[in-house]
C-alpha cells in the first residue's frame, strides 16, 4: 500500500518588525486613547505593538521608534510678544522623559532624527485661522492655545527608509508593520514587497491615499475608532488594563 505524499508547503514562521512614526503615533494615540504622562504613553506603545504581534501570531524582531529630539531654542510668540524658552517648556520635559522611557524598553530601538528646525515662528492653528477669516473670531479674542510652533522634522523619513531596506536585504524579517500616515516611505515599501516581505500599514484611522494603498499588502488597526476607543483597555480612563511588565517575553 502506497502512502499519498503531502506536497503542501510548510507554513513559514512569521517574524515581524514594527516601525513607528513617532510624531504620527503620539498625535493619533492622544486622539484615540487620551492624553497620558510620558511613562504611560511609552508603556502603551509597547502594548499596542504587542497587539499586532498577537494578530499575526508572530515573533517580534524589534520595535523601531522614529522621532526627533525636542526643540530647546528661544522663539518669539506673536500674541504675548515675549521670548519663549522651549527648553524649559512642559512639552520639552514630556518628550525628554518619553524618549528616556522608551530607550529602557525591551526590544525597542529609538531612531532619532536631526534636531528639529524651525523658522522661529508661531502660526495659527487651522481652526482659529478659518474662524478668523470667516469673521466668527476677532483678533482680540485669540489666545495662546490658538497658536502652534511651525516645526519641520529632519532625518526621520530617511532613517525609516534605510531600516526597511536593511531589513529586506538582510532577510531579518518576513513581515513589517508600519504605524504611519503618509506616503514618504512608499519606495522602501516597494523594495520590501519585492523581497517577499508582507507589508502592513496601521494608519490608526487616519485617511490613506490611493497611492499608498497601492504599495502595501493590507491595512490593520489594533484600536477602534472614536467613540468606541473610549472603551479600549489602553484608554487613559481605563488605566491600561493590557499593560504588562517589561520582562514579559511572550512573542518578544
Q: What is each PLM-predicted segment?
A:
Residues 11, 112, 116-252:
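Nuclease catalytic cores that cleave nucleic-acid phosphodiester bonds
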Residues 2-131, 144-145, 149, 198, ...:
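Domain-level signal for Mg2+-assisted phosphodiester chemistry and nucleotide/NA-binding surfaces
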Amino acid at each position: 500500500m502506497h502512502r499519498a505524499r503531502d506536497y503542501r508547503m510548510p507554513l513559514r514562521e512569521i517574524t515581524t518588525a514594527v516601525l513607528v512614526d513617532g510624531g504620527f503615533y503620539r498625535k493619533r494615540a492622544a486622539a484615540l486613547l487620551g492624553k497620558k504622562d510620558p511613562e504611560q504613553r511609552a508603556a502603551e506603545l509597547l502594548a499596542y505593538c504587542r497587539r499586532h504581534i498577537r494578530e499575526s501570531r508572530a515573533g517580534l524582531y524589534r520595535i523601531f521608534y522614529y522621532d526627533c529630539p525636542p526643540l530647546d531654542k528661544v522663539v518669539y510668540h506673536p500674541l504675548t510678544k515675549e521670548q519663549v524658552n522651549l527648553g524649559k517648556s512642559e512639552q520639552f520635559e514630556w518628550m525628554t522623559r518619553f524618549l528616556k522611557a522608551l530607550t529602557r524598553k525591551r526590544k525597542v530601538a529609538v531612531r532619532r532624527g536631526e534636531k528639529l528646525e524651525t523658522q522661529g515662528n508661531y502660526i495659527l492653528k487651522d481652526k482659529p485661522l478659518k474662524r478668523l477669516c470667516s469673521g466668527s473670531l476677532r483678533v482680540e479674542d485669540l489666545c495662546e492655545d490658538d497658536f502652534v510652533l511651525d516645526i519641520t522634522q529632519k532625518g526621520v523619513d530617511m532613517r525609516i527608509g534605510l531600516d526597511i531596506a536593511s531589513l529586506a536585504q538582510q532577510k531579518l524579517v518576513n513581515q513589517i508593520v508600519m504605524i504611519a500616515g503618509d506616503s514618504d516611505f512608499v519606495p522602501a515599501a516597494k523594495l520590501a514587497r519585492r523581497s517577499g516581505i508582507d507589508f502592513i500599514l496601521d494608519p490608526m484611522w487616519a485617511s490613506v491615499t490611493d497611492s499608498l494603498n497601492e504599495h502595501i499588502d493590507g491595512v490593520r488597526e489594533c484600536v477602534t475608532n472614536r467613540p468606541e476607543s473610549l472603551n479600549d483597555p489602553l484608554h487613559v480612563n481605563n488605566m491600561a488594563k493590557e499593560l504588562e511588565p517589561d520582562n514579559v517575553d511572550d512573542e518578544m
